[in-house]
């Protein structure tokens, strides 16, 4: 009897020993290399190896936290490869969330700084940002990712699906911070905040950075906090790295201190990876790295099972995972608490968040409102927090808003090898109370174009968002006898155009990503010109035509092009209908009599540009433009051509006067093949055709050799074309382009040039 009893007792003790055996998983940091951790987890799960605790640093903290919230390895891979993950790590806002209604007009600026309106009038430059990656995406994304798990855990990381720890670095006090509780999103984000790249999270008045600075492989934390029976470590960092000229590698070596990437044999096992060709942000390689991690771990399964006798079937794990996810509270918001603002600013911000019939709004609805508010220059940053309200069974939304009171100064223009050297200065101020107001002034000066514009805009609190915009503008543009390479301004202009106008516009959102403007305007347009080039410009006087015009207009537009000059992706569409009435006044230099003609016409213009992705290195752009008008001809041929709409699809065509590409009605289009070398460098071709509906022609009057009578030719009898090839360096702040182009008229019209900057002029009266 005694022997069977002893055997039974031993078996019982072994059973409890095995069933009580606990396993801890430790994941190192390493940026995109950390995707190998996914394969490690997948191999362990499929072979029944339990994971009872998880801890990680940096990328290991991201993957560890996802696992602790019930994500499977395949779900984590899908998230890492998603477009959203790419937006988070770059700070780029996807087009669906760009609030086009408040998008400012493109300007040729490439440097910005601001002047704080305080007693000291401090000047802050934006040349060196606080972080290379804009935190605008992470601020909202991490709240959406982690709020539900934080709520269910009651801010205690032991209450997650898998108990979790992560590491941050307090560089001011030179110590490691272990996150055991608090906001899970803040914990993970601080653990992955690589200096200079990401903006730090503040805790107890101290900024926290990437935990890998002091402890990139937290085996000690797992042992101290969880006391597991077995530790399995996955290390994607720590291998010997040869000295490199890559600045990113050099910064990593400077910042990261020594970490021991080992697990003592008596404590467990480790799998180490060496990925010398994978950089910090190459997450597109995640599937390849996951497969490597999976195969390496599979090769160790037998050895692991000799140390870990306990098994957890994958079906049982997945059932627990589903039950955990179903128990998470729904991410719905009701109460809003705003800090960092005045009472009137709080009212404005809360008005941007529209609740449903139950007084709630979803994360998706908040996301739209979040990016909408950040389109206001006055709002510098919004840091959202979601706190679960157990009484109401929804979340309270806390918004820490940073408001600026400053004048924004923009400087830019264009440096060119031809007649397109421009200097630009822009000043802007935005006021925010119960209403949002915009005040802007910009000045351009150059040897081809000069102009000044003042505008004021107020966004009204109406059921449908709307604004009123008042603009006052003056511009002067001249066209000279020569536009040759390295042109010096010695030759006089043979055409000078001036515009003075005022516009009042009512703006409204149109559909989702467009806006409509209903406008009234009054302007005086003046043209000084010679009606022939067969004269001595220096000794002759200009003919002059001026137009006092009133216009009513409707404009609908959308624009998702990725850059303001030489785009490679996106779409632009606009439609403008306008009715114009007024008088034409003409005075010829050799005739004292001034002629006056009444003018009335309706004009419709439309443009469509779209860039399609053919493959990773080739884009194909397609462009179409048309103008339909009831406009009559002016007093003479030159006046008619000058006031006819012009087709100017390239930067160079905007600063040259080419009568062959002007008509009151026309159809134009083109193709734009773009060959991408990398993110900053591409080669492009632009090929366009232009066909007037009725070409404006001239009849020479024998009695007046310097005056030509205009008339319309036959329909669709003329066709012109232009082409341009360009090598473009698209830097983050400026565009550099070397181009060569040609026009079908006049013959042998070829040009080569270099531009550094942007050729973008102020809007014109009849735009």
Language model: regions and residue ranges:
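Bacterial Sec-dependent N-terminal signal peptides
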Residues: 1-23, 767
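C-terminal outer-membrane beta-barrel translocator/porin domains of Gram-negative envelope proteins
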Residues: 408, 549-678, 682-695, 700-710
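Flexible glycine-/small-residue-rich
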Residues: 168-171, 273, 338-342, 401-405, ...
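C-terminal soluble interaction/assembly domains
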Residues: 356-360, 364, 705-716, 722-724, ...
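Gram-negative/organellar outer-membrane beta-barrel architecture
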Residues: 364, 375, 381-561, 565, ...
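Short glycine-rich, acidic/polar surface loops and turns
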Residues: 218-219, 251-264, 670, 710-714, ...
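Patatin-like phospholipase
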Residues: 20-57, 65-382, 386-388, 401-405
């Amino acid at each position: 009897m005694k022997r069977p009893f002893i055997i039974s007792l031993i078996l019982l003790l072994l059973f409890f020993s095995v069933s009580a055996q606990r396993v801890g998983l430790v994941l190192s940091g390493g940026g995109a290399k950390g995707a190998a951790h996914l394969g490690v987890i997948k191999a362990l799960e499929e072979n029944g190896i339990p994971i009872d605790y998880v801890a990680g640093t940096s990328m290991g903290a991201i993957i560890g936290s996802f696992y602790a919230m019930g994500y499977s390895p395949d779900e984590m891979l899908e998230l890492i490869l998603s477009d959203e993950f790419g937006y988070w790590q770059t700070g780029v806002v996807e087009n669906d969330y760009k609030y086009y209604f408040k998008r400012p007009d493109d300007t040729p600026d490439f440097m910005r700084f601001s002047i704080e309106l305080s007693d000291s009038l401090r000047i802050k430059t934006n040349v060196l940002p606080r972080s290379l990656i804009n935190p605008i995406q992470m601020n909202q994304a991490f709240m959406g990712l982690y709020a539900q798990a934080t709520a269910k855990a009651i801010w205690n990381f032991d209450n997650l699906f898998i108990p979790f720890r992560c590491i941050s670095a307090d560089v001011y006090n030179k110590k490691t911070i272990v996150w055991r509780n608090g906001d899970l999103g803040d914990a993970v984000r601080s653990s992955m905040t690589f200096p200079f790249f990401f903006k730090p999270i503040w805790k107890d008045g101290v900024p926290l950075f990437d935990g890998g600075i002091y402890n990139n492989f937290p085996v000690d934390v797992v042992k101290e906090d969880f006391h597991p029976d077995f530790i399995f470590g996955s290390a994607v960092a720590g291998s010997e790295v040869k000295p490199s000229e890559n600045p990113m590698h050099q910064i990593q070596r400077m910042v990261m201190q020594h970490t021991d990437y080992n697990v003592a044999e008596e404590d467990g096992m480790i799998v180490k990876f060496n990925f010398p060709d994978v950089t910090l942000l190459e997450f597109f390689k995640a599937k390849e790295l996951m497969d490597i991690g999976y195969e390496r771990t599979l090769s160790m399964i037998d050895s692991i099972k000799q140390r870990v006798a306990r098994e957890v079937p994958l079906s049982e794990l997945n059932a627990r995972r589903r039950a955990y996810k179903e128990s998470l509270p729904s991410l719905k918001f009701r109460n809003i608490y705003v800090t960092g603002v005045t009472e009137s600013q709080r009212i404005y911000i809360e008005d941007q968040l529209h609740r449903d019939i139950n007084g709630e709004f979803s994360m998706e609805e908040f996301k739209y409102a979040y990016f909408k508010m950040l389109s206001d220059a006055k709002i510098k940053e919004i840091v959202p927090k979601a706190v679960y309200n157990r009484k109401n069974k929804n979340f309270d939304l806390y918004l820490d808003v940073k408001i600026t009171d400053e004048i924004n100064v923009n400087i830019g223009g264009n440096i060119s090898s031809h007649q397109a050297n421009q200097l630009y200065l822009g000043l802007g101020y935005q006021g925010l109370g119960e209403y949002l107001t915009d005040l802007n002034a910009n000045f351009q000066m150059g040897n081809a174009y000069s102009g000044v514009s003042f505008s004021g805009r107020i966004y009204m609190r109406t059921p449908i968002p709307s604004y009123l915009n008042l603009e006052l503008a003056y511009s002067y543009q001249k066209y000279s006898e020569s536009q040759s390479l390295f042109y010096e301004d010695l030759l006089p202009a043979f055409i000078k155009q001036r515009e003075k106008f005022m516009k009042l516009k009512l703006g409204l959102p149109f559909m989702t990503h467009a806006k409509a403007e209903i406008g009234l305007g009054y302007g005086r347009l003046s043209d000084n010109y010679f009606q022939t080039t067969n004269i001595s410009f220096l000794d002759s006087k200009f003919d002059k035509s001026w137009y006092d015009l009133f216009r009513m207009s409707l404009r609908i537009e959308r624009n998702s092009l990725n850059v303001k000059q030489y785009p490679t992706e996106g779409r632009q569409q606009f439609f403008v209908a306008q009715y114009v009435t007024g008088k034409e006044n003409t005075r010829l230099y050799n005739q004292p009599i001034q002629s006056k003609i009444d003018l009335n016409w309706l004009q419709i213009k439309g443009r469509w540009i779209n860039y399609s992705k053919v493959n990773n290195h080739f884009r194909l752009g397609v462009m179409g433009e048309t103008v339909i008008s009831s406009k009559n001809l002016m007093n003479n041929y030159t006046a008619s051509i000058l006031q006819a709409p012009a087709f100017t699809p390239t930067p160079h065509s905007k600063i040259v006067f080419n009568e062959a590409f002007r008509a009151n009605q026309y159809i134009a289009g083109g193709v734009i093949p773009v060959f991408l070398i990398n993110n900053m460098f591409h080669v492009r071709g632009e090929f366009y055709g232009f066909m007037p509906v009725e070409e404006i022609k001239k009849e020479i009057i024998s009695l007046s050799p310097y005056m030509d009578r205009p008339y319309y030719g036959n329909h669709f009898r003329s066709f012109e074309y232009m082409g341009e090839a360009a090598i473009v360096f698209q830097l983050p702040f400026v565009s550099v382009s070397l181009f060569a182009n040609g026009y079908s008229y006049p013959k042998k019209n070829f040009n080569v040039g270099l531009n550094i900057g942007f050729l973008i002029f102020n809007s014109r009266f009849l735009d």
